[in-house]
Structure formats: structure tokens, C-alpha cells
Amino acid sequence: MLTLRNIRVWDTGEIIDMVIPSADARNQPEDGGVIEGDFDATGLTVAPGFADPHVHFRDPGQTYKESMVSGCRAAASGGYTNVLIMPNTVPAMDGRAVKAGAPGAAEVLDAGCSDVIDYLQHYERVHDVSLPVRYDLCVCASKDRSGVEASDPADWLRHLDGHDMDGKDAWQLAHPVTAISDDGAAVTPGLLDQVLANVKEAGLYLIEHCEHHDTGAVNDGPVSRKLGVPGIPEDTELKIVARDIEKARETGVHIHFQHVSTAISFDAIRKAKAEGLPITCETAPHYLALCDEDLLEYGTLAKMNPPLRSAVDRQATIAAIADGTVDLLATDHAPHTLEEKERGFLEAPNGIIGLECAYGVCHKVLVDGGYISDQRLIELMSVAPSRLMGHRPTDVAALLNVTAPCASKRTLDLSLSLIHI
């Protein structure tokens, strides 16, 4: 049994003693040990587990960068209990049967699975492992994420909640498809109407990476010129945001904008939300903690997509969080090898890890900086993303008033993230 005494509940401020049965008090180390004992938790806060609707776990196809096991452990280490896996796996997560000999196909086929969605839904059974976080899946908007032909709902509808699958209700699926995206690029213009029709048919939402550009590696401006690297103009993001706002107005389909990074995009989103349009947006810790000037110190380690923007854009990002324009915070956790990241600006891949350190970074910038409260930060990292992902946000204080076994187990599932404040 694990007893945490004098722990603070995140939303009510109540100081409580929290008792967790040994069967539920699982530790994260590889030995799978159990935490037991009686601890004074004064100065700690118990909160709903964080949820991240934007992670890249590289499994299958690139497990030398990250596997489901290492990705889920990273999430758990950062206090996350729910994540949404993006579809840029290898092969891509479009629901089609993989072909023998294709990159990454062996992992799927050797597991006795037909496609990537099937592989990830059965990962724990196939690999005989218990992962420490829940995960849902995001399906490709286009076949192979190529932007050429829209993915076919017939290939993935069976993986949604509410659809019959092999004689059992799909609500029993541990890892359903809950969103559609071609993350890494925006949905191409010629496919957008069909993709939105697919989204509407499935009752999901579209996640948009708001960029279309063929050149450039960092933000266009004085830093890109100093580095001698082609720049990416800020309006590449705005063009997609503006386009999709009009489509949301026209169709009524919920569009969620990923990792928004520019002041002009936040302005457009702010105005659209004032109209009541069905749009939401996120930003990521690196856009509120860093700007393109940090490339001069960190080099390609700070290369990402969208790129780190100007100091003005960084402040606009913080302001958009403070005024409620930003609905939630997501990490865009995207691991690569050090060898890959140390290539030149034109060759190094985009991406940065973030699950382990997201709360600390956001707390330092936003709470210590006086922009928002810690309670609001937890809402942005837990309640709001859980709601987007289709999970019912759970009030920990309310759980503590139900029967002890239910309270302890469900509270642990949602909240074994003890936050120093």
C-alpha cells in the first residue's frame, strides 16, 4: 500500500491523505517494482494525468529512434497518462494492408498483423508488454501521407469507436482511431474537400499541420540570413490557417490547428473563435520557451517544423495562451538520433523531444512568469487535451468522494503525476 499524506488537490486546494493499494501503485523503472510506504507529500500536488494529442513514437519502422515502449515510458516520466500517436509511421498509418518488402513492413507482418493500425492496437499482446500510458491513434488524411489521394474510410472505419469489429463492439478497443491528419504537412488543396467529407462521415476531427513549403529550414528573418540558411516565411502558416478557417465555416467540421507559432496566425484564430467557428488550436513548449535566436546557440538541435519563430512571435504565443486563444498544450514529441540531428541545417530532420520536460518548461515560462496559474496550466495539459481526444475529463476531488477502491484506482490512473510547486 502507498499512502501519500498532506497532498494538495490541484483544483480545490484541499489537503488530503491519498491511499493507493499495492496492486495499483506501479513504479516506472524497468524492474516493474511496486511503490509502497507512508510518505509525507507536503508541497506536492496531485492532478489529472496529462494528455498529449501530438506525439511521434516511430513504431513501426524507425524504432532505432523510439519504440512504443520507450515512448510510453517517456510519457509516463513526464506525468502523461494519455497520448495520441501521429500517422507518420513507416509504413504510414492509413489503414491499408502493408506489402511484404516495403520499409517497416516486416515488423507488422511478423507480428501477425495486416496493417499499422492493427499492429498498434495489438502491440501489448504481440510483444507481451504492459505499457504505462493509454494511447489512441490518428489515421492519415491521404494514402501513405503522400497528399495525392485521400485515404479510404473503408480501410480504417472498423478501427473507430462504435463500429463493429470481428464480432465485438469497437468501444472495447483499447486503442481506437480518434482523429485524421497528414501531420508533417497540411492536407493538399485538391484533397481537402474529400478529406473533410471523410472526417464528417467518421464523426472525427481534422488535425492540421499548417504549412505548405518546398524550401527553407528555419524561420525567415535576420537569423536565417546570418546562418546563410533558406528561410520559411511566417505567412506559410497563416495561408493554411486562413484557408481552413473558411472550410470550417463552410462545412461545420471541427478543425484543430497543430503547433501554431506566429502572431498573425493567432490573430486569425482569435477572430474566428470569436465568430464561434468549430476550430481549436495548440502550441508546444518550445514555441513559448525558445525563438529563432536560440538557433545560434543550439544549431540543428533546435531545428523543427514549424521553425522556431521570432522573439515577437514567442511573446505572441505566450499572450495567446494567457488570453485563451490557445486551447491546449501539446509536445509534438519527435525523437531522432543525435547523428541525424547533427547534420547540417538542410539535411537534419525536424523535431525535438518534449514529453519528459514539458510541464517543467511550461511552468517555468508561464506560471513563474506570472502569465497563468498552475491550475490553468494543468487544465491546458490535462483537461483540455483529454476533452479533445474524446476522454472524459475527470475531477480528482470528485473521485475522492466515491468508494475507496474506485477512488484510489481511478485517481492513480489519471494522476500519478506528483507536481512540485
Describe these PLM feature segments.
Residues 7, 43, 54, 75, ...:
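Divalent metal-coordination and catalytic microenvironments
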Residues 42-130:
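Metal-associated gating/positioning segment near the N- to mid-region
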Residues 150-329:
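Histidine/acidic residue-rich metal-binding segments in metalloenzymes
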Residues 226-254, 301, 328, 334-414:
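His/Asp/Glu-enriched, well-ordered alpha-helical/loop segment
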Residues 419-421:
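Conserved small/polar residues in nucleotide/adenosyl-binding loops
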